[in-house]
């Protein structure tokens, strides 16, 4: 073992703590670093691992140099100078998903994309469970991947972020998918091309690639021998036939849209991707169809949270990028008789908001924009009727005043939440509480 022979875990969030637990169980010497002076949960971690050496408040150069390898949490960029220096020196720098891939013995489905990852991961997990696979479901969603290894799973279903894929080298999934790609995390990546390259790593070594024929950025490399596509495109293997209201597999009807609990184009795409993956895994199709029919979605994802006076209120707080808001605005705008009042804004992450301009013109009664980058969002939406508001309380009251019977009020921020909230869930809960209070008055 090289040098002092310890693994250095960088970042003490949920992922970092799972890595420490895993390596300690393997009998590996471990040390840990967090650039925060007082990481949340540090006292509990030290109580659980009293022999663990921890440095906080920055990088400890001596440890960085002596460690045999670095295990970097997703929230820490490999391009950070202190880490990049170790890469240049030839040190192994990996993440928790790489450790998982080296240890897992059962088939893996790897799911990434700018949007819908959690929905597709959850629904596929439900399908696999209905088929008796006892799936291990997690990764970027819920349970850290390494904590799934002891669950006697016959199949792993992992949601993976671009950050996790950056430090993963031997994934070799049974089925891998990039659901969609739109601008996101441009505050971390030098360019959209770099972000796309990180997403495309999910296909490395996979047996089957499932991709979105409506989004060519998701297309896998030609080196993947077996490729299955989904989408509204006429040549998609699993296709949405909007004209006849059906989902098809190579021209044969699977089910009617009227049979689904979920509505909207984006939800049809999610269900098609799940059915494509399920078939690629040779899961029971009848059980898969029965499961997708009754799926009602996840919290904070186009979730109907209130209804009063002919106005419906939707919480889509998980929409932290333009692509997600575009899908929600189009899906809801197409499905209602009235107009949409959009509540958006927050931390823009360097995105281009101009793709929202056309659907905003078509579907919006008004956009109520809050948060640090609200002016930037308004500029991107150009001619759309925009109002700048101070916070969620003002936005909800104003939406209530503007809404007419047949309208929908949609919280779909297209931005991160950390300028005003602890996360997207707190933002969505704030919207939901205020909407329900108004509707019950």
Swiss-Prot record:
Record-linked Gene3D superfamilies: Mur ligase, C-terminal domain, Mur-like, catalytic domain, NAD(P)-binding Rossmann-like Domain
A Gene Ontology term for the protein's cellular component: cytoplasm
Enzyme class: ligase
Coiled-coil annotated residue ranges, if any: none
Record GO terms (molecular function): ATP binding; UDP-N-acetylmuramoylalanine-D-glutamate ligase activity
Pfam families, sorted: Mur_ligase_C, Mur_ligase_M, MurD-like_N
Pathway in which the depicted protein is active: Cell wall biogenesis; peptidoglycan biosynthesis
Entry keyword annotation includes Cytoplasm: yes
Family: Belongs to the MurCDEF family.
PANTHER family: UDP-N-ACETYLMURAMOYLALANINE--D-GLUTAMATE LIGASE
Protein name: UDP-N-acetylmuramoylalanine--D-glutamate ligase
Annotated source species: Alcanivorax borkumensis (strain ATCC 700651 / DSM 11573 / NCIMB 13689 / SK2)
């Amino acid at each position: 073992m090289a040098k002092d022979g310890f693994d250095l875990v960088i970042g003490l969030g949920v992922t970092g703590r799972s890595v420490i637990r895993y390596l300690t169980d393997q009998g590996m010497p471990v040390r840990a670093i967090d650039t925060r002076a007082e990481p949340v949960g540090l006292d509990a971690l030290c109580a659980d691992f009293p022999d663990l050496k921890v440095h906080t408040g920055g990088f400890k150069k001596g440890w960085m140099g002596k460690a045999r390898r670095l295990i970097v949490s997703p929230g820490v960029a490999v391009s950070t100078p202190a880490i990049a220096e170790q890469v240049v020196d030839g040190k192994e720098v990996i993440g928790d998903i790489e450790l998982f891939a080296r240890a897992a013995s059962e088939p893996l489905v790897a799911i990434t994309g700018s949007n819908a990852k959690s929905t597709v991961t959850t629904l596929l997990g439900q399908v696999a469970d209905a088929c008796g696979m006892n799936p291990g479901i997690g990764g970027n969603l819920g349970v850290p991947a390494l904590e799934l290894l002891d669950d006697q799973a016959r199949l792993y279903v992992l949601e993976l972020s671009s950050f996790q894929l950056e430090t993963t080298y031997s994934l070799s999934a049974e089925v891998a998918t990039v659901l969609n790609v739109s601008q996101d995390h441009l505050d971390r990546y030098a360019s959209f091309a770099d972000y796309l390259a990180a997403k495309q790593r999910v296909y490395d070594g996979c047996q089957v690639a499932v991709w979105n024929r409506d989004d060519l950025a998701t297309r896998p490399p030609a080196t993947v021998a077996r490729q299955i596509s989904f989408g509204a495109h006429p040549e998609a293997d699993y296709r949405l036939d909007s004209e006849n209201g059906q989902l098809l597999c190579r021209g044969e009807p699977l089910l009617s849209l009227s049979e689904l609990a979920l509505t909207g184009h984006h939800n049809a795409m999610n269900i098609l991707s799940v059915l494509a993956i399920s078939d690629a895994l040779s899961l029971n199709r009848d059980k898969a169809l029965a499961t997708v029919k009754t799926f009602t979605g996840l919290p904070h994802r186009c979730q109907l949270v209130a209804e009063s006076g002919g106005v419906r209120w939707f919480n889509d707080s998980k929409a932290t990028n333009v692509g997600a808001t575009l899908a929600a605005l189009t899906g809801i705008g197409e499905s209602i008789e009235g107009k949409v009042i959009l509540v958006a804004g927050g931390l823009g992450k360097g995105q281009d908001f101009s793709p929202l301009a056309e659907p905003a013109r078509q579907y919006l009664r008004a956009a109520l924009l809050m948060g640090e980058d609200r002016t930037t969002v308004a500029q991107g939406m150009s001619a759309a009727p925009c109002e700048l508001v101070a916070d969620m309380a003002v936005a909800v009251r104003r939406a209530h005043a503007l809404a007419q019977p047949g309208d929908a009020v949609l919280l779909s921020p297209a931005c991160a939440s950390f300028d005003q909230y602890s996360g997207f869930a707190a933002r969505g809960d704030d919207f939901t509480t205020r909407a329900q209070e108004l509707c019950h008055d």
